[in-house]
């Protein structure tokens, strides 16, 4: 049995909140640079350069890359042999978000009631937390603060099995075209296929935060990732919607078994910043 204190978890979450808001992930930085060099459009190149310059300034000055520092999504993978001491795991995570957004001077974007009492909680809590219990004594946290300019562009559809591969392609392209410039492209896109109404959205989020350039382990899905990314970049939406061939930096797919009568599909859209940090304690 391995013990981890709540204070250790709180400190880790606080640090990740600040770093995720101010430091562009390395895979995103590499992808932006690569797409900049590949662009034919001078305006698209200039736009990508502005995005890279903005990220550099943010890191140097320890300021947010974007004013929308998002709602915090926290994914915890916890081994059965781990014992949390010193309080509640859930509250330790919430306190880390609270401290990170306060001490990092990050915008507080969470309202306490979605419809009637839309008053700000003033500390960006509650975070949305998911737990995955596994064997062993691992304890891994992924933090992915998500802005809602792109979140509002995400969609789910309960396709029929008869809709097949073409139905999935059509839906993904519809979501991207509906999003257009509103998702602050170039986008990072996660596609979930299978499971159920609730599971498929989790798959899409998991796919969205997967490393840019990685592929689904099954070759047919890996090929579909490449095909969809090419189709998206042929739309001409381009960086910030100004045209060009860089509408998306990445498209990843995650899958799960599903019912014989269904084929759920979800598309999770993220802006180019794609904030995420990981730590193992």
Predicted regions, residues:
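Non-transmembrane, aqueous-exposed alpha-helical and coiled segments at domain scale
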Residues: 1-281
